C-alpha cells in the first residue's frame, strides 16, 4: 500500500507514520507531503515530497499512484492575525486535497477534523454527540475552529467526482509523548512551568496520540463516510485535570478561580500591556475565553466501527509529563 500524508511532520502525523511502520509497511511507501521536512522524519526513513496544500497541481502530482491519503495538514493558532493563513490551509487546502485525491484516483482519504467542530458547550451538563449539530454558534468567533468547521463540511459532503471515499475523524485535545513542537501539549507545559495563574472554569476532552494514530490506521479500511468519528478518552473539568497533574508531578495547583467573565476581562486588559513591554502574555484573551467553555463530546461510532478503545487518562498524562520534563 502506498500512502501519502499532508501534515505528516506534525505531532499526529509522525505518530501515524510510526503506527504504519509498526504494522510492517515500508517507510519508503509512506510519503509526507509538506513545504519543509521535519528533522524527526529522517529517523523514520519515510519519503518526502515538497508541496503545499495551497498548490492544487503540486498535490495532484504528489497523490499520483497513491492508494491512501491522510489529510492532516493544519495550523493551530489562537492569534487572530493568523486567520488568513488558517483559511488557506484548512479550507482551501482541504478542498485542494480532496479534489487532487479524486483526480488521482485515490481510493480513500482520511481527514483529521476536531471535536471542537461540534463538542463545545457553555453548559457542562450537556455533552454534545458526534451526530448532533455543529458548534458554529459558539466557536465561529475563533478563526481556527471557524475554518476547521468549514473544512469538515467539505469532507463530510458527498464528493462530486470520482470514487474516492472520505472518512472524517475527530480527535480531541491530543496529548502523550513526542510533541517536540509543543503544538498540542503547551497547556500541560505551562502548568509544569508555573504559568497557570488561575484555574479556568471550563473542561476538556483529551486523547493519547498513540491511540489516535492507531484509529487513523484502522480508518484505512473502516469508518462511515459522511459521519464524524470521535476520538476521545474522557471529559474532565480543568480543575480535575490540574488536580491530576498536581498529583503526578508535585506541582502546586493554583488556588484562585475567579468568575469566568473576570478571567476573560483580565486577560484582555493585561495582554496588550505585556506586549508593550516586549513580553508574551501569560494568558492571551482567546485562550482565556476558550478555557471557560466545556469542550466535551460523546460518541460511539469510533468504538463500534474502528474498535477504538483509548488507554487510561492517567497513563496519557504520566507519559506526557515524562516526555515534557525530559526535553525542557
Regions found by a protein language model. Name each.
Residues 139-167:
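Active-site Tyr-X1-5-Lys
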Residues 215-282, 299, 304, 313-328:
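Mid/C-terminal beta-alpha module of Rossmann-like enzyme folds, strongest
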Residues 89-143:
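Conserved Rossmann-fold NAD(P)-dependent oxidoreductase catalytic core, especially the SDR/UDP-sugar
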Residues 3-25:
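N-terminal Rossmann NAD(P)H-binding glycine-rich loop of SDR-like oxidoreductase domains
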Residues 96, 183, 200-221, 227:
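Substrate-positioning beta->alpha
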Residues 36-42, 46-92, 100:
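NAD(P)H-binding glycine-rich loop region in Rossmannoid oxidoreductase-like domains
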Residues 135-140, 189-207, 211:
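A conserved pocket-lining segment of Rossmann-fold NAD(P)-dependent short-chain dehydrogenase/reductase
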Residues 118-119, 164-185:
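Flexible, glycine-rich beta-alpha linker
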